[in-house]
Amino acid sequence: MKKKLFVSELIKHFDLEVLNHDFPEIEDREILTPSIKRLGLELSGHFIYDAISGVIVGWGTNESKFFEKIGSEKAKSSIEEIFSRKIPMLVLSKGFDKNYYSTIIEIANKHKTPVIFYKASLSEINTILGIYLLQYFAKKVQVHGTLVSVFGMGILIVGDSGLGKSEAALELVQKGHVLISDDAVLVSHYGNKYFGKAPYITKNLIEVRGLGLIDILSVHGLKSVLPECEINFVVELKDYEQNKSNFDRLGNKVLKYQIGEWKIPKIEIPIRQGRSVASLIEASANMFLSKLNGHDVLAMIQERSLNDE
């Protein structure tokens, strides 16, 4: 089912100032897309289908200058045409000319549309509201796994049941790292990044065999939990005996973990009795950071071998 967001929810979340709040017949319309449209051709009367229906419209300094240029009558006609398209709300930035407020509010009331004033530039409004809208509308996939933040890197730990994902997460928390979610992770993708969070019912909880449910927030404090974080890579725990001929010994393979149509960088860790999984996950985080900084161990070895000849 498609997620819905109504204007009233956005107004409440950001405590937005509604300029025509005293007009009782304003409709609580549904926002259909995660974007704020500035309008270009539309202001001059050229519309492509109903491209702005269900889209938040934002106006700033450039729009008020355009209205000034075309004159009050044409400006009024243009504003009327915009509101007739059933936009959910209009956001005016601090740079928009207040001389047009009365005209806009009069037309907005006629079409039962809320007009919002946000004390920021339109680019700032696009960033603040836009990020929230992207997160709200982003597709979410539930994954069986555990999400932790290690040295600031979001690591999704996956693998068969019984390999010690939760135990490793608990040990990482005891070492000072951060839990985001255990057992189930809601993964979303927006921009070019992946993010994970806990389902509400399991938030801040770890289930460890023999101990039961542990409330990490109560036991280890606020520093040990986060509501959400970016997923930088996946660590897949694999039974050594069942997969010993398939492991990448040199770490030179490019591995990916697939979640739906998404592919996230992956590191495989073989699990054997007596190995500290938490320490290996810490090492994988350090290796990942090292690679991001351009350090390539295999290239270094090749260079050494050439210099040794």
Swiss-Prot record:
Enzyme nomenclature, EC number: 2.7.11.-, 2.7.4.-
Active site: H144, K165, D183, R249
Cofactor: Mg(2+)
InterPro entries, alphabetized: HPr(Ser)_kin/Pase, Hpr_kin/Pase_C, Hpr_kin/Pase_Hpr_N, P-loop_NTPase, Ser_kin/Pase_Hpr-like_N_sf
Region ranges (Important for the catalytic mechanism of dephosphorylation): 270-275
GO MF terms, alphabetically ordered: ATP binding; magnesium ion binding; phosphorelay sensor kinase activity; protein serine/threonine kinase activity; protein serine/threonine/tyrosine kinase activity
The keyword Kinase belongs to this UniProt entry's keyword annotation: yes
Residues that bind ATP: G159, D160, S161, G162, L163, G164, K165, S166
Pfam families: Hpr_kinase_C (PF07475), Hpr_kinase_N (PF02603)
Keyword Manganese (UniProt): no
Binding site for Mg(2+): S166, E207
Catalytic function, reaction form: [HPr protein]-L-serine + ATP = [HPr protein]-O-phospho-L-serine + ADP + H(+); [HPr protein]-O-phospho-L-serine + phosphate + H(+) = [HPr protein]-L-serine + diphosphate
Annotated GO biological process: regulation of carbohydrate metabolic process
Region: Important for the catalytic mechanism of both phosphorylation and dephosphorylation, residue numbers: 206-215
SUPFAM superfamilies named among the record's database cross-references: HprK N-terminal domain-like, PEP carboxykinase-like
UniProtKB keywords: ATP-binding, Carbohydrate metabolism, Kinase, Magnesium, Metal-binding, Multifunctional enzyme, Nucleotide-binding, Serine/threonine-protein kinase, Transferase
Comment on protein domains: The Walker A ATP-binding motif also binds Pi and PPi.
Family the UniProt entry places it in: Belongs to the HPrK/P family.
Subunit structure: Homohexamer.
Note: Both phosphorylation and phosphorolysis are carried out by the same active site and suggest a common mechanism for both reactions.
Protein task: Catalyzes the ATP- as well as the pyrophosphate-dependent phosphorylation of a specific serine residue in HPr, a phosphocarrier protein of the phosphoenolpyruvate-dependent sugar phosphotransferase system (PTS). HprK/P also catalyzes the pyrophosphate-producing, inorganic phosphate-dependent dephosphorylation (phosphorolysis) of seryl-phosphorylated HPr (P-Ser-HPr).
Alphabetical list of HAMAP family matching this protein: HPr_kinase
The protein, known as: HPr kinase/phosphorylase
Source organism: Mycoplasmopsis pulmonis (strain UAB CTIP)
Gene field: hprK
